[in-house]
């Protein structure tokens, strides 16, 4: 009798073992820790991102010659759109930040394991690690970043994330989904590189072996605040350019044109509009994300 030579079908137990093995992989753990930390920080600081976007896109005719501050925009949003209006754009923010932060930390962990092999990074290595990891995450999440920016601006009435993706693709093509990508990378990659450098260097100054274990998260958070402020100041102009290119891709088609038009309409000050809410949000988000990430990685027995 001829025996059936076909391989046996994969059993449910085998599938379960494979999934369990994947979940135990350090890179997957780093991705999960990063995703959870990104969720926490996004929920808390979304209003600051919305205020930043509104401040950056105010037209001179909207307020005459008067300078509009963050508090005035905050009160206007609450008055016209309710308190929950401050969380407009939350869905694309979550869709962007949760996997985006996970991709960032997962890539960062992989690069550190491959290139550093256990030794602490130098200042230059920290910059390169941050730039590389953020670039990967930025390219992957660019379409969601475009949608998030348009939601927050209040100038687009998309019904859902899927509807927004379909509308942008039909009206602007695939380029519309990646509008402002160069400006985004010029903003995010240097921010992550500069942030990681200052964060690691500041942590190296602090004698962690002499700090009470319960105070280590607070110490790490403080280091993150310091690093975030410096990185935010350096990358603010790129953020303004990115916002305009994503909201008005037909008007701002390339970076040089965007720089010229923003300077013409707003002057040098235009490149720093929305700087305060952005610095607050980016600094607090990065500090919280890194603190939560490092604590979770330590609980899993992994070195972050």
Curated annotation (Swiss-Prot):
Q: Which GO terms describe its cellular component?
A: mitochondrial inner membrane; mitochondrion
An example Gene Ontology molecular-function term: glycine transmembrane transporter activity
Membrane topology annotation: Multi-pass membrane protein
A biological process from GO:
erythrocyte differentiation
Transmembrane portions of the chain: 31-56, 89-115, 127-152, 180-203, 219-245, 274-292
Question: What keywords would UniProt list here?
Answer: Disease variant, Membrane, Mitochondrion, Mitochondrion inner membrane, Repeat, Transmembrane, Transmembrane helix, Transport
**Can you state which reaction this protein catalyses?**
glycine(in) = glycine(out)
Please give the family membership noted in the entry: Belongs to the mitochondrial carrier (TC 2.A.29) family. SLC25A38 subfamily.
Its protein name is: Mitochondrial glycine transporter
Say which species the protein is native to: Homo sapiens
Q: Which gene encodes it?
A: SLC25A38
């Amino acid at each position: 009798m001829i025996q059936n030579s076909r391989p046996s079908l994969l059993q449910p137990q085998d599938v379960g073992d494979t999934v369990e093995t994947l979940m135990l992989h350090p890179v997957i753990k780093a991705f999960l820790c990063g995703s959870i930390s990104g969720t926490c920080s996004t929920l808390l600081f979304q209003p600051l991102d919305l205020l930043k976007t509104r401040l950056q896109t105010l037209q001179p005719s909207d307020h005459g010659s008067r300078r509009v501050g963050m508090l005035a925009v905050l009160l206007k949003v609450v008055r016209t759109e309710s308190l929950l209006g401050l969380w407009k754009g939350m869905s694309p923010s979550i869709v962007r930040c949760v996997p985006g932060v996970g991709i960032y930390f997962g890539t960062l962990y992989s690069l550190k394991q491959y290139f550093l092999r256990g030794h602490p990074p130098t200042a230059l290595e920290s910059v390169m690690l941050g730039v590389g990891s953020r670039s990967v995450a930025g390219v992957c999440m660019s379409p969601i970043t475009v949608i998030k920016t348009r939601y927050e601006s209040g100038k687009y009435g998309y019904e859902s994330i899927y509807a927004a993706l379909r509308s942008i693709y039909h009206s602007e093509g695939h380029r519309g989904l990646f509008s402002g990508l160069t400006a985004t990378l010029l903003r995010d990659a240097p921010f992550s590189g500069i942030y990681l450098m200052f964060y690691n260097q500041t942590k190296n100054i602090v004698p962690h072996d002499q700090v009470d274990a319960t105070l280590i998260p607070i110490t790490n958070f403080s280091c993150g605040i310091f690093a975030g402020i410096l990185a935010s100041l350096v990358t603010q102009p790129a953020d303004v350019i990115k916002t305009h290119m994503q909201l008005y891709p037909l008007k701002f088609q390339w970076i040089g044109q965007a720089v010229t038009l923003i300077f013409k309409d707003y002057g040098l000050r235009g490149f720093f509009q929305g700087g305060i809410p952005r610095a607050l949000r980016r600094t607090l988000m990065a500090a919280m994300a890194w603190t939560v990430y490092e604590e979770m990685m330590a609980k899993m027995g992994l070195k972050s």
